[in-house]
UniProtKB/Swiss-Prot annotation:
One of its GO terms (cellular component) is cytosolic small ribosomal subunit. Part of the 30S ribosomal subunit. Forms a tight complex with proteins S10 and S14. It comes from Paraburkholderia phytofirmans (strain DSM 17436 / LMG 22146 / PsJN). NCBIfam families: rpsC_bact. The gene is rpsC. Keywords: Ribonucleoprotein, Ribosomal protein, RNA-binding, rRNA-binding. Residues 39-107 form the KH type-2 domain. Belongs to the universal ribosomal protein uS3 family. The keyword Glycosyltransferase does not apply. Pfam families: KH_2 (PF07650), Ribosomal_S3_C (PF00189). GO terms for biological process: translation. This is Small ribosomal subunit protein uS3. The lineage of its organism: Bacteria, Pseudomonadati, Pseudomonadota, Betaproteobacteria, Burkholderiales.
Length: 268
């Protein structure tokens, strides 16, 4: 089922980490999760021109830390940091706790799945041919180090009356391999004919030694006592010549040879 399941959820705690990293009890969990969704929607609308790839939200000790990954950090920060201060004050009103905002730059936006999907949807809204937009994005990703990429578009492509799905793939995209670093994202293009959905899978190699992969400590397995164990512990190893012989053999003195067809008694 690797072809159908969400690639990020399939790899959580194995080779990918969560986008919301906090703990809450049952009473507060739903409210905090809804708050995270609202913050992400607000940032997506507010920073539409800043090429935001993903947003990581952490909640340590009655405050919040939000990390914004963007290929254009200057647009997020603004002149002399004015825009980021306004953004921080708005986020504090929404979340009700002190908020620290960090900006991380995406070095290769051509290999980031979310930025690729957003770029394709923007081109579709400008009436650019979907095949040209998809193939150009695939060429740029492969040129800058991606080992494989797959792009799927679905909807009324080129304004046709019957919706259809088209996809292209270049390189390897191993969806069943858990250690494979698969970057997955979706986006929607709102055209005059309706919505066109775009999905992007980018294979960047294996996640051995990746920084954001969760580290699982291996605990040494303790030897559990068996039920009805011997009081003195396990049986000591058997030495040669002691208690040997095939199963069912009689122990003690060797059996005397009897007469032919007799009952084992010798004649007197």
């Amino acid at each position: 089922m690797g072809q159908k399941i969400h690639p990020t959820g399939f790899r959580l705690a194995v080779s990918r980490n969560w986008a919301s990293r906090w703990y809450a009890n049952n009473n507060n969990f739903a409210a905090m999760l809804q708050e995270d969704i609202g913050v992400r929607e607000y940032l997506k609308k507010k920073l539409k021109n800043a090429s935001v790839g993903r947003v990581v939200i952490e909640r340590p000790a009655k405050n919040a830390r939000i990390t914004i990954f963007s290929s254009r950090p200057g647009v997020v920060i603004g002149k002399k940091g004015e825009d980021i201060e306004l953004l921080k004050s708005e986020l504090q009103k929404r979340m009700g706790v002190p908020v620290h905002v960090n900006i991380e730059e995406i070095r290769k936006p051509e290999t980031d799945a979310q930025l690729i999907a957003d770029s394709i949807t923007q081109q579709l809204e400008r009436r650019i041919m979907f095949r040209r937009a998809m193939k150009r994005a695939m060429q740029n990703a492969m040129r800058l180090g991606a080992q494989g990429i797959k792009i799927m578009s679905a909807g009324r492509l080129n304004g046709i009356e019957i919706a259809r799905t088209e996809w292209y793939r270049e390189g390897r995209v191993p969806l069943h391999t858990l250690r494979a670093d698969i970057d997955y994202a979706t986006s929607e293009a709102k055209t005059t004919y309706g919505i066109i959905g775009v999905k992007v899978w980018v294979y960047k190699g294996d996640t051995l030694g990746r920084n954001d992969a969760p580290v699982v400590e291996e605990v040494a397995e303790e030897k559990r006592p068996r039920r009805n164990a011997r009081p003195g512990g396990d049986r000591r190893p058997r030495r040669d010549g002691e208690g040997g012989g095939p199963a069912g053999a009689r122990r003690g003195a060797p059996r005397r040879a009897g007469g032919a067809g007799g009952d084992g008694k010798t004649g007197e």
